[in-house]
């Protein structure tokens, strides 16, 4: 195996090792792939969001950004990508117009599409594009290796998000268990008066409106604040500012 090819693999391995510590940047991954393959690189997740991009020619940046909006491609374009179940290399001309429509402006570039699949689940797509000459076998192998890195990272991020959501739910449940029946009732009324995730309340008005005591309302707020569920700030005569930090608190009321 060529020495330079091994060096390119090592660069991608470096990105993967950084990922395990939570430091991966999709932009950095795209930059490295763009550098070693000499092509424009786009990492797109399964929902059509552009996670990262890198360009060999600055003039290409705005063109593709205009067409994709950079942050998200159209649903129809994303569907076309998801229909690609295996690496599709060196697509050009009419085949690109068939995929993305006649208005697509880069039909003169060679495109390679590499699905990112991990654990049998489709997680995204790496799109590569360049002028002048088609992608060779080595470049396609590197792109497929990059797609594996992307799949592992997306899967890791999904797992972290799920764990974070579960931790939020658990925190709310534990905090809820510390409330007395009257404090739970007070919390229900507070949330009714706070339609958004933040706002101002006047404890005395809520107490009078629902037949509660100020002390019960204050106690409920203090317990939830100490549990990290919300934060409060006294506004003096204007009442109390409340900001909900854990959105799952509403699900238990």
Segments from the language model and where they lie:
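Juxtadomain coupling helices with adjacent low-complexity linkers
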Residues: 1-29, 68, 124, 130-177
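Structured interaction and signal-relay segments at domain junctions
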Residues: 2-14, 18-107
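Short coil/loop residues immediately preceding or within conserved phosphate-binding loops
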Residues: 38, 111, 239
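Acidic surface patches and DE-rich sequence motifs
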Residues: 45, 118, 235
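Sensory/regulatory domains in signal-transduction proteins
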Residues: 83-153, 157
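Signal-transducing coiled-coil/dimerization helices and immediately adjacent hinge/linker segments
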Residues: 156-247
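Short, amphipathic alpha-helical interaction segments positioned at domain boundaries
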Residues: 247-253
């Amino acid at each position: 195996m060529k020495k330079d090819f091994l060096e390119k693999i090592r660069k991608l391995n470096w990105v993967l090792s950084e990922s395990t510590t939570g430091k991966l940047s999709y932009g950095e991954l795209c930059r490295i792939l763009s550098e070693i393959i000499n092509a424009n690189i786009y990492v797109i997740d399964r929902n059509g969001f552009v996670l990262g991009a890198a360009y060999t020619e600055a003039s290409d940046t705005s063109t593709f950004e205009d067409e994709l909006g950079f942050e998200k491609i159209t649903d129809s374009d994303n569907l076309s990508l998801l229909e690609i179940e295996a690496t599709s290399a060196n697509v050009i001309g009419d085949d690109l117009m068939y995929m993305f429509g006649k208005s697509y402006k880069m039909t003169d570039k060679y495109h390679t599409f590499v699905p990112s699949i991990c654990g049998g689940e489709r997680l995204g797509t790496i799109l590569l594009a360049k002028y002048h000459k088609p992608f060779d076998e080595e470049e396609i192998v590197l792109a497929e290796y990059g797609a594996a890195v992307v799949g592992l990272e997306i899967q890791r991020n999904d797992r972290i998000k799920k764990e974070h959501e579960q931790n939020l739910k658990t925190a709310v449940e534990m905090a809820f268990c510390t409330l007395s029946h009257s404090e739970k009732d007070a919390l229900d009324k507070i949330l009714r008066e706070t339609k958004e995730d933040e706002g101002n309340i006047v404890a005395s008005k809520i107490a009078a409106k629902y037949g509660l005591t100020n002390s019960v309302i204050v106690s409920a707020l203090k317990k939830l604040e100490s549990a990290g569920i919300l934060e409060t700030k006294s506004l003096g005569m204007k009442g109390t500012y409340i900001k909900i930090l854990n959105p799952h608190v509403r699900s238990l009321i």
